Amino acid sequence: MSPGLDLEQSFSQALEGLGLSAQAARMLWLPFPMLLVLVAAVVGVLVTVWLERKISAAVQQRVGPEYAGALGVLQPLADGLKLLVKEDIIPDRADSILFTLGPVLVVVPVILSWLIVPFGQNLLISDVGVGIFLWISLSSVQPIGLLMSGYASNNKYSLLGGLRAAAQSISYEIPLALAVLAVVMMSNSLSTVDIVNQQTGAGVLSWNIWRQPVGFLIFWICALAECERLPFDLPEAEEELVAGYQTEYSGMKFALFYLGSYINLVLSALLVSILYLGGWGFPIPVEWLASWLGQPIDAPLVQLITGTVGIVMTVLKAYLLVFIAILLRWTTPRVRIDQLLDLGWKFLLPLALVNLLVTAALKLAFPVAFGG
């Protein structure tokens, strides 16, 4: 297996080549990962917002944004700048501290979760051995921020929206975690890198989606519910709750909710790509590519090609899922709150438990195929 590109090592070697010491190069690297995550997350959101507006326009037989840049690609940037300069209003009887802290607690855990997303063998910010556990832990913080925002607004619609958001997030967090646990059981690791490496044996046929079709569907449905996408957008249902927990927010605080929602959608799509669709898996064995180029498998040229293709493969798979999520938003009706909770507790949770038990049995019966 090709070791792939190593961002930290390449960065340090480049700075040391300019005459800096190894310690100085390491110090300069420290803020770079978070900057890289922020840039990647914001660019991902801008692309997703543009895709959503163009796809929704196509579904409704409209043109969509077309004047702000070619094909309207600058429209999301214009919307973001508009929100930046809008007045930030705090209601008179709102709890100003909790009102301000709520959006921060919603968006910060989502951004931190990007640290464990790999785009290649060494193309990730933090290869912690418990990356999946870290992501589940961070995602469990978000309902606190949603409930805090609804409560602090001193508005009945905001409070109901916050309660709905917390109930929905808790209801779907459990089956989602059980679906991921089945994948972890097969790969014998909580590391996202190990999970992708476990899917590289036979190309497309070794993807986890073939061994975990039920887990894949459970994860995707729960991810849409966690992102509050239609048909699961009850916390901000306009006909019932005005804008839910976002009702009293404006300016940059409202933009944080908007940003967090789309960052979470792109993150969920990337995680589905990593857990079930082989991640950065190269379409052909790397040994064949190295042989065709007449280079050793660890040659810089081979690493560059495999790293680039890995990033492209991961992003393409993720945006295919984003496209499906956008289509679902504009083609499916909203469910009722009782239907949403029944789906989570009475259907997905038992199904996820059965899927986990069946995976454990298959792992014992067929250890080679199921990662024994």
UniProtKB/Swiss-Prot annotation:
Keywords: Membrane, NAD, NADP, Plastoquinone, Quinone, Thylakoid, Translocase, Transmembrane, Transmembrane helix
Catalytic class of the enzyme: translocase
Transmembrane parts of this sequence: 27-47, 97-117, 128-148, 166-186, 204-224, 266-286, 308-328, 347-367
Main localization, broad class: membrane
Subcellular location: Cellular thylakoid membrane
Gene Ontology CC terms: plasma membrane-derived thylakoid membrane
Subunit structure as annotated in this protein's UniProt entry: NDH-1 is composed of at least 11 different subunits.
MF terms (GO), sorted A to Z: NADH dehydrogenase activity; oxidoreductase activity, acting on NAD(P)H, quinone or similar compound as acceptor; quinone binding
Protein EC: 7.1.1.-
Function (record text): NDH-1 shuttles electrons from an unknown electron donor, via FMN and iron-sulfur (Fe-S) centers, to quinones in the respiratory and/or the photosynthetic chain. The immediate electron acceptor for the enzyme in this species is believed to be plastoquinone. Couples the redox reaction to proton translocation, and thus conserves the redox energy in a proton gradient.
Disulfide bonds: none
Catalytic activity annotation: a plastoquinone + NADH + (n+1) H(+)(in) = a plastoquinol + NAD(+) + n H(+)(out); a plastoquinone + NADPH + (n+1) H(+)(in) = a plastoquinol + NADP(+) + n H(+)(out)
Protein name per its UniProtKB record: NAD(P)H-quinone oxidoreductase subunit 1
Superkingdom, taxonomy of origin: Bacteria
Protein's GO biological process: aerobic respiration; photosynthesis, light reaction
UniProt cross-references to InterPro entries, sorted A to Z: NADH_UbQ_OxRdtase_su1/FPO (IPR001694), NADH_UbQ_OxRdtase_su1_CS (IPR018086)
Membrane topology: Multi-pass membrane protein
Protein family membership: Belongs to the complex I subunit 1 family.
